[in-house]
UniProtKB/Swiss-Prot annotation:
Function: Catalyzes the NADPH-dependent reduction of N-acetyl-5-glutamyl phosphate to yield N-acetyl-L-glutamate 5-semialdehyde.
SUPFAM superfamilies assigned to the protein according to its UniProt record, in alphabetical order: Glyceraldehyde-3-phosphate dehydrogenase-like, C-terminal domain (SSF55347), NAD(P)-binding Rossmann-fold domains (SSF51735)
Sorted UniProt keywords: Amino-acid biosynthesis, Arginine biosynthesis, Cytoplasm, NADP, Oxidoreductase
Protein name according to UniProt: N-acetyl-gamma-glutamyl-phosphate reductase
Keyword Amino-acid biosynthesis: yes
One annotated Gene Ontology cellular component of this protein: cytoplasm
Pathway assigned in UniProt: Amino-acid biosynthesis; L-arginine biosynthesis; N(2)-acetyl-L-ornithine from L-glutamate: step 3/4
Catalytic residues as annotated in Swiss-Prot or TrEMBL: 149
Sequence similarity: Belongs to the NAGSA dehydrogenase family. Type 1 subfamily.
Biological process according to GO: L-arginine biosynthetic process
Catalytic activity of the protein: N-acetyl-L-glutamate 5-semialdehyde + phosphate + NADP(+) = N-acetyl-L-glutamyl 5-phosphate + NADPH + H(+)
Gene3D superfamilies: Dihydrodipicolinate Reductase, domain 2, NAD(P)-binding Rossmann-like Domain
HAMAP family tied to this protein: ArgC_type1
Amino acid sequence: MLKVAIVGASGYTGIELLRLLHGHPEVSVTCVTSEQSAGKNVAEIFPTLRSRYNLVLENLEPVRIAERADFIFTALPHKAAMEVVPTFLKLGKRVVDLSADYRLHDAREYAAWYEPHMNPELLKEAIYGLPELRREKIAEADLVANPGCYPTSIILGLAPLLKKKLVNPATIIADAKSGVSGAGRSAKVDNLYCEVNDGFKAYGVGGVHRHIPEIEQELSLLAGKQLTITFTPHLVPMDRGILSTIYAEPAGEVSLAGLVELYRDFYHGEAFVRVLPENNFPSTAFVRGSNFCDIGLTVDKRTGRIVIVSAIDNLIKGASGQAIQNMNIMNGFPENLGLESLGLFP
């Protein structure tokens, strides 16, 4: 039985890790931390866990945690993770980090979008944890950087086209919409019910959203050359889910039937990517509560552009579910352990 610690367990990604790991036959959660809620039982913070967990939230003390856990999930805010991850690694623990602290390979790029990195040497060692593209490297990694939610939906949506060089990378536009849980659990005026309900707004407009360098880094690796995309995120008044609509001009003549076949071949055997039939498109309603990424696509007959639509649950395939998928790979477990739940409906 793998003993697991969740560092930063009182946020939305923390509760999702606890919920999903409860059904994992090879895992026992032995330690949970929260600086703000230390001393409280997790069921006080998340009543949904009543009678299923009897864990008390602790202060973050890496040495004590490492004594009781074999594997660490860090679900901390950006910057906070880099303060503790090196210690866990030195103590011989393997880590999946759910923050953005280790997703970028270039320390200068990280500093430009966030702030100077405290341990830039680890940026080269961390493996970007998108299992469908990095499975072999994830299996050998000590530190996996769990991808962001928007990047997951966009990279999976574009990977087959870029790998086969079927689109002009300079024409890529990604228009994505997210539920409010993507902003985290801390109290913010912009996320209050009266501020969000009955509204739909763009934010991070004009190439300033922090997920951009992560998206461009991974798409550039797929394309084999540096690329720049246009990305605009939107906030939708729903709890969870991301729907990304992606546009790109083909590099040559394409057919819809050929594109669907390409995607099915590319994702053949993948447990959590579902390619829909021609002219069928995903909905966040059908992936809610699951680790699936649903992808549909078409060719706009008027403009010739390829249109890809992808849907994920931002808290699961976009965060905690993907983190568990990475943990499974790192420990030689079947990849789908603990992640077989179908989406909630309605």
